[in-house]
């Protein structure tokens, strides 16, 4: 069975701004008109569903982007998203695969820096892309045991990027051109595996393992500015204490970061020149070690 769809969206966004703290004289009155079409095909053949789609998406910059780009006003970003894949289902297992190519024009990417309140700053890059494959496997060994495994492999690149370094010797900025570099804070490999044990209708126990590959703190693909890869294990249990027609009580217990791994999933970097020497400062947001969480959820219907 072959089916198709077409989705047409038109958006109008108006920006009005009467300056802000660092640039009180910046007066903005801009209107963005976006046409976002999407179309796709799918074909159902017994246990397999094939699909393909293409979509255009436009997105306006946000207030933080204006504050980060005092000299040059940020542009809207445009995306053409191509996707294709399949879903294969059987009573005891299922396999999904999805290929994608996201072609950006003027993508607003993280710069690796933060503003005066600690929020990440973004800038437009003329040409960039994100491409990859997503795979997911679900398998039920029996009524009590099941597992889900997913993996994402991607390449996230900026075709051309200019890095600006503050030079305190000359009171100016040094521009460094980079070609075909990785987009900041974009891991190339991420995996997730969940093992579920359900001994009865009241109790479910989940063991989740997540892996994130190394990431770059900024868009220079500099090996001295990275976030290390990490592997996490979490265990959580859900126990349904009471399940009535109008009243449900659920007890949940979580053990996060079971192996007490020291890791930082986010951070920022800043480089400057002083006394003819370049200094780079990498800063990290470390997460908690092993931690516990107990909750009681009550639903009234």
Predicted region positions:
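C-terminal beta-signal and adjacent terminal beta-strands/loops
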Residues: 103-105, 147, 155-157, 213-216, ...
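Residues on the lipid-exposed face of transmembrane beta-strands in outer-membrane beta-barrel proteins
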Residues: 1, 39-45, 84-88, 133-139, ...
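Transmembrane beta-strands of outer-membrane beta-barrel proteins
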Residues: 4-8, 37, 50-52, 95-97, ...
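Gram-negative outer-membrane beta-barrel transporters
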Residues: 13, 101-103, 123-220
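Outer-membrane beta-barrel channels and translocator barrels
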Residues: 1-3, 44-48, 89-93, 130, ...
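Surface-exposed extracellular loop regions of Gram-negative outer-membrane beta-barrel proteins
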Residues: 1-22, 29, 32-83, 94-95, 151-153, ...
């Amino acid at each position: 069975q072959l089916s198709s769809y077409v989705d047409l969206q038109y958006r109008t966004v108006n920006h009005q701004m009467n300056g802000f703290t660092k640039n009180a004289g910046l007066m903005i009155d801009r209107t963005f008109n976006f046409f976002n079409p999407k179309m796709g095909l799918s074909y159902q053949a017994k246990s397999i569903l094939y699909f393909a789609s293409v979509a255009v998406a436009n997105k306006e910059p946000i207030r933080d982007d204006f504050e980060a780009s005092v000299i040059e006003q940020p542009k809207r970003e445009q995306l053409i998203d191509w996707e294709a894949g399949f879903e294969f289902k059987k009573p005891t297992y299922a396999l999904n695969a999805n290929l994608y190519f996201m072609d950006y024009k003027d993508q607003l990417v993280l710069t690796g820096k933060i503003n005066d309140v600690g929020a990440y700053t973004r800038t437009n890059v003329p040409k960039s892309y994100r491409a990859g494959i997503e795979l997911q496997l679900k398998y039920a060994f029996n009524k009590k045991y099941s597992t889900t495994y997913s993996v994402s492999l991607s390449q996230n690149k900026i075709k051309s990027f200019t890095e600006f370094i503050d030079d305190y010797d000359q009171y100016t900025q040094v521009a460094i051109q980079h070609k075909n570099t990785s987009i900041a804070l974009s891991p190339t490999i991420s995996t997730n595996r969940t093992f579920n044990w359900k001994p009865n209708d009241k109790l479910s126990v989940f063991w989740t393992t997540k892996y994130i590959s190394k990431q770059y703190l900024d868009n220079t693909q500099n090996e001295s500015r990275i976030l290390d890869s990490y592997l996490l294990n979490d265990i959580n249990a859900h126990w349904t204490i009471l399940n009535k027609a109008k009243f449900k009580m659920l007890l949940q217990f979580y053990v996060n970061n079971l192996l007490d791994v020291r890791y930082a999933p986010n951070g920022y970097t800043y480089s400057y020149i002083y006394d003819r020497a370049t200094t780079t400062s990498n800063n990290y947001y470390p997460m908690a070690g092993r931690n516990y969480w107990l909750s009681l959820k009550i639903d009234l219907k």
